[in-house]
Regions:
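Extended boundary segments
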Residues: 1-49, 120-122
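Short, basic/aromatic beta-hairpin or loop at an interaction surface
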Residues: 45-60
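Short alpha-helix capping/helix-loop boundary micro-motifs
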Residues: 62-69
Length: 124
């Protein structure tokens, strides 16, 4: 039996997206392991401003790369983004919304829970 990984709230990690299918393992969740050097753990609801900022920051998430199983993203897609990239977007004032219940706890090594909660769309 596989142990479910945890989110930033200490609860079971919820699915981020299966359309497009996301995650380091391409399992729909922001699961991670020590081989995930990019720490693809933030479940973000991307918007055009964030996507353009990422492209200018050197991480083009718009252009499809089927050889890597990457469809290219558009406004409104959910995607497991790199925690360090998301942290830089917060500092640059270009951060998009996030789902904290779908964001892996490892994210907290790079971004505080308070910063994440400012952009959370799944908290009451």
């Amino acid at each position: 039996m596989t142990v479910k990984q945890k989110n930033v709230l200490g609860e079971d990690l919820e699915e981020c997206s299966v359309d497009p299918v996301t995650g380091w393992y391409r399992d729909g969740c922001c699961n991670t392991d020590n081989n995930d050097l990019g720490v693809h753990t933030v479940c973000a609801k991307v918007n055009n401003e964030f996507l353009e900022w990422c492209k200018q920051d050197g991480n083009d998430l718009i252009t499809p790369h089927p050889e890597y199983g990457f469809p290219g993203l558009k406004d409104g897609d959910n995607w497991c983004v790199c925690a360090s990239s998301y942290a830089r977007s917060v500092d640059a004032g270009k951060a998009c919304s996030v789902y904290v219940k779908r964001t892996h706890e490892k994210t907290l090594t790079l971004i505080s829970i308070d910063k994440l909660k400012k952009f959370a769309i799944d908290l009451s």
